[in-house]
Structures are given as C-alpha cells and as structure tokens.
C-alpha cells in the first residue's frame, strides 16, 4: 500500500506531464530535424548538333508594356479598423493575337491587335475593432482574397512578322462526256459536261499559333476607405474603393523554322529564316 507522500509524488508527476502535454499541444514542437549530407556529382558538357542546321524555335513577334486602369469597389465581410497589408499578383486568362487586324504594307503585316484579359488577385489583411476602451483599441487581424478582373485591346508592332497561311481557292475540274452511251449512270444521256462526277482540289496550310508570355507587372494603387461609422467612439469602415494603374509586360511569340549558321568571326551563331 502506497504512503501519502508517494501518492502525492505520483499526482504531482502526472500533473506535470499533463501540463507539459498541453503546452506542446498549444505551442507546437519540432517533429524532426536532420542535416543532409553533400552528394557528389559530375559536371557534364552537353553535346550539340553541328551547324548549319534548321531548327524550330520560338521567335519573338512583339513585346509591349500595356497600361490598364482599373477601379473596383468591394465590401468586406465585417467592419474594419484599418488596412494592415495588401499583397497583389497579376494573372492573364486570355492573350489572343489577331495577326492581320492592323496595318499591312505590300502584303506584309506591320501591326496586329492583341486582346488581353486577366485579373489582379489581392489578399487584404485588416484589423477589426472588437474591444474599445478609453485610449485602447483591440481586435483581430483577418484577411480576405478577391479577384479584380480587367480586359483591354492593344495594338502591337511586329519585330518579326508572323508566318501566316491562307486557305487556297478551291480548284474544280469538270469532266466531259463525249458519247451518248457514256457509262456515268446519270438519269439522262447527253453530250457535254459530266454532271454526276467532278474533281475537287483544296489547299490548306496550317501554321503555328502565336502565344504569349507574361514577363512582369507593376501596380500603382490607391485604397479609399468609404462609408465610415462609429462604434464605441472609434471610426470603422465598411467599404473599400480601389483605384489601380496596372502595367503588364507581355511578349508575343511564334514557333518558326530558323536556319542557324556559324559566323566567320566566331562571336556566336547567325539565324536566317
């Protein structure tokens, strides 16, 4: 039978373990940590085909920085005391080139129309005013994420004109029936054009579709807090008006066949389409 001191010691030990377990549960802990060794390797020099060679590579058609002005109004889920931080990212959902919708000189396109669509994704961190007492305002830091869409059309000037292919005019060959007993299985037998048979020729040229790359973006923004109201003597807001100037830089490319030749000077390679 355990004495009173032993029972008290076991109780204190169990209480300490329980408190220690709760502390780790609330604060977190390091599950595992290890130092990784260095793995040795061998540097390999890549091999390349000898020039001259014909390669199919992306060719830059145009590159442009486009300015897009956006104004948006949003209502947060709850009233906020102040905006703490706003993180922004830009995404494109459409970048379509109409290659022959611009200026054409001597049959060669000089400019084209570029249709852009996308959105600015904003993560807004704001502080609430849950407890207001005298000169102290306490609350929580919360966040919300929104997508502000934009769309525009711009004209790009070609650095290299795109390769285009048009459908040729259909060629039709009529056949002649020169005998009354022509075995063409037509309803009537007559001299002249063979009405129940003909030859057709279509010429279809397929080319690579131009595509875009988003190189970067700059955003200038003004956030105007609207519809203020007072709670416990402190001003809080319910609505946010955003004015943004978005500069996006896009590059338009097309896969084209390019002849790559060595230069005599040895300064690099020369490309010829």
Swiss-Prot record:
InterPro entries: CsxC, DUF7852, Exosporium_prot_C. Signal peptide: none annotated. It comes from the Bacteria. GO terms for cellular component: exosporium. It is found in: Spore wall. PANTHER family: DUF3794 DOMAIN-CONTAINING PROTEIN, EXPORTED PROTEIN-RELATED. This is Exosporium protein C. It comes from Clostridium sporogenes (strain ATCC 15579). The lineage of its organism: Bacteria, Bacillati, Bacillota, Clostridia, Eubacteriales.
């Amino acid at each position: 039978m355990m004495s009173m001191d032993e029972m008290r010691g076991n109780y204190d030990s169990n209480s300490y373990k329980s408190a220690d377990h709760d502390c780790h549960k609330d604060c977190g802990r390091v599950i595992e940590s290890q130092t990784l060794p260095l793995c040795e390797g061998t540097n390999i020099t890549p091999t390349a085909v000898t020039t001259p060679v014909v390669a199919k590579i992306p060719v830059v058609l145009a590159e442009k920085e486009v300015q897009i002005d956006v104004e948006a109004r949003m209502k947060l889920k709850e009233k906020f005391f102040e905006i703490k931080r706003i993180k922004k990212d830009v995404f494109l959902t459409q970048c379509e080139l109409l290659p022959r919708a611009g200026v054409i000189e001597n049959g060669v396109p000089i400019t084209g129309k570029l249709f852009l669509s996308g959105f600015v994704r904003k993560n807004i961190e704001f502080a609430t005013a849950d407890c207001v007492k005298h000169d102290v305002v306490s609350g929580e830091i919360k966040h919300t994420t929104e997508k502000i869409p934009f769309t525009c059309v711009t004209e790009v000037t070609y650095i290299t004109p795109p390769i285009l292919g048009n459908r040729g005019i259909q060629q039709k060959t009529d056949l002649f029936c020169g005998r009354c007993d022509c075995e063409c299985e037509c309803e009537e037998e007559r001299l002249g054009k063979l009405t129940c048979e003909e030859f057709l020729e279509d010429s279809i040229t397929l080319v690579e579709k131009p595509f875009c790359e988003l190189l970067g973006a700059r955003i200038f923004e003004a956030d105007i807090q609207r519809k203020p109201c007072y709670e416990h003597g402190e001003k809080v807001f319910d609505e946010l008006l955003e004015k943004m100037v978005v500069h996006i830089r896009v590059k338009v490319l097309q896969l084209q066949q390019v002849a790559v030749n060595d230069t005599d000077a040895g300064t690099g390679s020369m490309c010829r389409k």
